[in-house]
């Protein structure tokens, strides 16, 4: 049987560039090499696109995927024809953060009419923007913690007023977050005015729009969602931390976080979380995959935190492990996502774009 031609796109002009390399290594190694011919495209930190070789062997070190300058091709040439001279059956973007999971590259795939894994333009962009995401969750009646948002220009013009607004609406501790980054990049836990100002100024290095959320003493539980119009969910898992909060360093470097799968919670709460995860998936018109993150308090109150349209996706990340607990292997999950991409593309092809 002829192999399907899949293009893995990784790297990206983002603070989460190195995370993307780890993800690409993990996915490439897990893909069924008898079923798929795997091409690669590396996007440098400066935004340059480099066409990599077809890969059929195991990648032992993610640094091998950090390509140097090679033959220059146009982006459309890279995306439209595989190394074997055939059109791709699907592209698989493994990009985190701005320019990768925020709808921009998804728009490129749409314009070039290429099947791609994961969420579409609308879902990717709204899931990346924490403020827009919260506004959409509100339309579905999903419970959320109080928050304040503002722009860099507003903070620079009215710093004292912004601080007063935060302290008037929220109580310490609070969490300062760039609106458009993932992997906990730029997030700070703030316990007083001094740390709040420092946290704001740190976060503004990564984004022009910030969200400041009420801190809460709660467990962090997550549900994986997979599908298109009729998504399936997993049992919830829990992020168990040996640190004050789950930042970039504890996620990827220190090993101070462990995942409990499934989470030790009642069947009633499990069911409620899974239902809310589907509501969140639908609120942002998602497809393919999403990880829905929640806070669960001691008195069993549930608050949705966010949806992640391109969740951590190494073999040891929460999303694949949640599915492994449900009996779906990492390799099978990748195959399912590719098939969902082709299914969605086929459905779009049946849409009329002109009147008879």
Swiss-Prot record:
Cofactor(s) demanded: Mg(2+); Mn(2+)
GO CC terms, sorted: cytosol
Subcellular location: Cytoplasm
MF annotations from Gene Ontology: ATP binding; D-alanine-D-alanine ligase activity; metal ion binding
Signal sequence bounds: none
Reactions mediated catalytically: 2 D-alanine + ATP = D-alanyl-D-alanine + ADP + phosphate + H(+)
Domain ATP-grasp: 134-339
Protein name, entry field: D-alanine--D-alanine ligase
Binding sites annotated in the UniProt record for ATP: 167-222
Entry superkingdom: Bacteria
EC assignment: 6.3.2.4
Role according to the record: Cell wall formation.
One record GO biological process: regulation of cell shape
Gene name tied to this protein: ddl
Binding-site positions, Mg(2+) 2: 306, 308
One of the Pfam families matching this protein, by short name: Dala_Dala_lig_N
UniProt keyword terms in alphabetical order: ATP-binding, Cell shape, Cell wall biogenesis/degradation, Cytoplasm, Ligase, Magnesium, Manganese, Metal-binding, Nucleotide-binding, Peptidoglycan synthesis
